[in-house]
Structures are given as C-alpha cells and as structure tokens.
C-alpha cells in the first residue's frame, strides 16, 4: 500500500510531468491565462489521463503483447486516447451542457496533449501493473492540474501587476514557469 502512495506522491510532486518531464507545455502555456478555463481543462484532463492510462495498459497487455504487435504501440495508444476524449466529450455533453459549453474547444485539444501519450508510454516502459498504471495516470493528472491551476492563478495576478513592458505577456509567464519549476525541485529528495 505504501508503494502506491509513494508512486502517487512521486508522480504529483517529484516527477511532475509539466515541470520536470516538460510534457503538456502547450496547454500549460495556452490555457493558463484564466483560472476558470484552467480548472475546466484540469478536470477534463484528469478524467482522460486516468482512463487513457488504464485502457492503454489493457490494450498493451491483452492485445499488443500476446500478438507480438509492439511496433503498433504508439499508434494504438493515440487511437485509445482519441476514443477516450470522444467518449468524455459525449458524456459531458449529455450530463452537463453548461460544463460542455464552458470547456468548449479544450476537450478536443486533450487529444493532442503530449502528456497523455507520455503517461501511457511511460507506464509500459516502467513496467507498471494494472493498479500502478491507474495510480500513475491519476497522479500525473493531479500533478498537471495542480501546476496548471497554480500557474493560472499566478498569471491572473501578474496581469494586474505593474510588469515592465519588455516582460509583459509570454516573457513573464516563462520566467514564472521557471521559478515554479525551481520551487518543485525542492521535492526532489521526497521520494526515492
């Protein structure tokens, strides 16, 4: 049980996919200008990342490995991710039309988020079992969400701050992301 907790904490804080592995930088920079959109993207990404991680593990174990189709791994994982995103979009549209409108274009954009494919491939490379795959996917999603929401809150405050003209916009966002990455480096010794 403690192994699973260490995997979760390690994935969320120590080996954060955005700040340490540099995966998912496009939505990190693109969706983080408003806190509302960052929260919506975080919720959708958490669901998709967790489900895609589990399904990718199952596809690999019960389809690709038994039939010696390892060379189709990346393509099949992309297909799994696209199916999960479409399923998520249909589910959200059917259950909550207001949430679907709020998420808007962000749902289909999850398909192109490299963090989702990265988690699926790292699950296989690190030889995780089913439960570890689920925890790894969920931990990666929580880490992505944590960083996205924190960064979004900082960018909203920076928009209201008196920032020198050369640093306005993307420049101060990159400096802030770098400082945030340095702060997360403090978690390095937390999990071995």
Curated annotation (Swiss-Prot):
GO cellular component, one term: plasma membrane
Domain of life the protein comes from: Bacteria
Membrane spanning residue stretches: 5-25, 39-59, 65-85, 102-122, 134-154, 171-191
EC annotation from Swiss-Prot or TrEMBL: 7.-.-.-
Keyword field: Cell inner membrane, Cell membrane, Electron transport, Membrane, Translocase, Transmembrane, Transmembrane helix, Transport
Subcellular localization: Cell inner membrane
Any one GO biological process: electron transport chain
The keyword Transcription regulation is annotated on this UniProt entry: no
InterPro entries tied to this protein: Ion_transpt_RnfA/RsxA, NqrDE/RnfAE, NqrDE/RnfAE_oxidrdctase
Any coiled-coil regions, as ranges: none
Main location: membrane
Membrane protein topology class: Multi-pass membrane protein
Pfam families xrefs: Rnf-Nqr
Function: Part of a membrane-bound complex that couples electron transfer with translocation of ions across the membrane.
Family: Belongs to the NqrDE/RnfAE family.
Subunit composition and interactions: The complex is composed of six subunits: RnfA, RnfB, RnfC, RnfD, RnfE and RnfG.
Record-linked PANTHER family: INTEGRAL MEMBRANE PROTEIN OF SOXR-REDUCING COMPLEX, ION-TRANSLOCATING OXIDOREDUCTASE COMPLEX SUBUNIT A
Protein name in the entry: Ion-translocating oxidoreductase complex subunit A
Organism per entry: Shewanella piezotolerans (strain WP3 / JCM 13877)
Biological classification of the source: Bacteria, Pseudomonadati, Pseudomonadota, Gammaproteobacteria, Alteromonadales
Record gene name: rnfA
């Amino acid at each position: 049980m403690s192994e699973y907790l260490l995997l979760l904490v390690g994935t969320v804080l120590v080996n954060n996919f955005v700040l340490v592995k540099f995966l998912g930088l496009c939505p990190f920079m693109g969706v983080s200008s408003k806190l509302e959109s960052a929260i919506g993207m975080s919720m959708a990404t958490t669901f998709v990342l967790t489900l895609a991680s589990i399904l990718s593990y199952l596809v690999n174990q019960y389809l690709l490995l038994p039939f010696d189709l390892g060379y189709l791994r990346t393509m099949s994982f992309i297909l799994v991710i696209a199916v999960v995103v479409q399923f998520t979009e249909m589910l959200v549209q059917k259950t909550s039309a207001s949430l679907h409108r709020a998420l808007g274009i962000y749902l289909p954009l999850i398909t192109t988020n490299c963090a989702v494919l990265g988690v699926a491939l790292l699950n296989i490379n690190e030889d995780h079992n089913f439960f570890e795959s689920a925890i790894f996917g969920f931990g990666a999603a929580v880490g992505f969400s944590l960083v996205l929401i924190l960064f979004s809150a900082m960018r909203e405050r920076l928009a209201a701050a008196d920032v020198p003209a050369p640093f306005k916009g993307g420049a101060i966002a990159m400096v802030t992301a770098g400082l945030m990455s340095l702060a997360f480096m403090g978690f390095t010794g937390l999990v071995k």
